[in-house]
């Protein structure tokens, strides 16, 4: 039987392990950069790498609740904030690479790039939505906003997930290469679909308990 909670020492060890594992992609980029091993197109390499890890960690963050509900491992909730902050970290790197390196902080160049490649607008929107999520991730902000308002705000992560997939899909559409993004889209669909199912089932059970006549299946 899977443990619902972990002893403090075990939980601390898990959190440290997750922290280190999530840091590995960044350290890899640093090492590859220091040894001049980014390949023929360094900008494309670091942009793709940071974007990929943003999406991977976003999926991991969204997977915490389904895994907790399906396995009963309630201790998983203790690593969700860390995963979310790492998602924001890699998303920030991804954005800054485009802003500082690709566009050189040139407003005219940025506007032109957005007009030419609208998928960048979608990616920027996803990044902007992550900012309030990261800013309100502390316990102090939960208390300040109140649990219910905090939960409503953090539902923006679902919109961020959809926009992230759309950003990647739109980018790959120009190359007609949908193999990898289709995997992420399928994972995201499952993670969000489970939530929709649980909400629908809860509402249906509530209606039955209240004496309403359910619709036929």
Curated annotation (Swiss-Prot):
Q: Per the UniProt entry, what are the Gene Ontology biological process annotations, in alphabetical order?
A: protein repair
What are the names of the required cofactors? Answer: FMN; heme b
Database matches in InterPro entries: Fe3_Rdtase_TM_dom, MsrQ-like
Query: Could you tell me which Pfam families the record lists for this protein?
Result: Ferric_reduct
The subcellular localization recorded is: Cell inner membrane
Main localization, broad class: membrane
**Gene Ontology CC entries for this record:** plasma membrane
Superkingdom field: Bacteria
Which molecular function GO terms apply here?
electron transfer activity; FMN binding; heme binding; metal ion binding; oxidoreductase activity, acting on diphenols and related substances as donors
Q: How does it sit in the membrane?
A: Multi-pass membrane protein
Sorted alphabetically, the keyword list is:
Cell inner membrane, Cell membrane, Electron transport, Flavoprotein, FMN, Heme, Iron, Membrane, Metal-binding, Transmembrane, Transmembrane helix, Transport
User: Signal sequence: where?
Assistant: none
List membrane-spanning regions: 82-102, 118-138, 150-170, 180-200
Q: How is the cofactor bound?
A: Binds 1 FMN per subunit. Binds 1 heme b (iron(II)-protoporphyrin IX) group per subunit.
In terms of PANTHER family, this protein maps to:
PROTEIN-METHIONINE-SULFOXIDE REDUCTASE HEME-BINDING SUBUNIT MSRQ (PTHR36964:SF1)
Instruction: Give a short account of what the protein does.
Output: Part of the MsrPQ system that repairs oxidized periplasmic proteins containing methionine sulfoxide residues (Met-O), using respiratory chain electrons. Thus protects these proteins from oxidative-stress damage caused by reactive species of oxygen and chlorine generated by the host defense mechanisms. MsrPQ is essential for the maintenance of envelope integrity under bleach stress, rescuing a wide series of structurally unrelated periplasmic proteins from methionine oxidation.
The similarity comment for this entry is: Belongs to the MsrQ family.
Subunit relationships:
Heterodimer of a catalytic subunit (MsrP) and a heme-binding subunit (MsrQ).
Q: What's the protein name?
A: Protein-methionine-sulfoxide reductase heme-binding subunit MsrQ
Species name: Ralstonia nicotianae (strain ATCC BAA-1114 / GMI1000) (Ralstonia solanacearum)
């Amino acid at each position: 039987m899977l443990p619902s909670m972990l002893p403090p020492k075990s939980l601390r060890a898990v959190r440290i392990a997750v922290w280190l594992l999530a840091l590995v992609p960044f350290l890899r980029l640093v090492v590859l950069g220091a040894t001049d091993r980014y390949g023929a197109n360094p900008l494309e390499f670091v942009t793709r790498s940071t974007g990929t890890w943003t999406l991977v960690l976003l999926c991991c963050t969204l997977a915490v609740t389904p895994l907790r509900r399906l396995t009963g491992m309630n201790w998983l909730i203790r690593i969700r904030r860390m995963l979310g902050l790492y998602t924001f970290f890699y998303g920030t790197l991804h954005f800054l690479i485009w802003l500082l390196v690709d566009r050189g902080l040139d407003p005219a160049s940025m506007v032109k790039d957005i007009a030419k490649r609208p998928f960048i607008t979608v990616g920027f929107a996803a990044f902007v939505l992550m900012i309030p999520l990261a800013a309100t991730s502390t316990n102090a902000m939960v208390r300040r906003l109140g649990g219910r308002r905090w939960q409503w705000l953090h539902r923006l992560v679902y919109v961020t997930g959809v926009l992230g997939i759309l950003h990647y899909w739109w980018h790959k559409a120009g190359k007609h290469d949908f193999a990898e993004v289709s995997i992420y889209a399928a994972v995201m669909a499952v993670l969000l679909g489970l939530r929709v199912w649980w909400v629908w089932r809860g509402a249906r059970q509530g209606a039955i308990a209240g004496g309403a006549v359910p619709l036929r299946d």
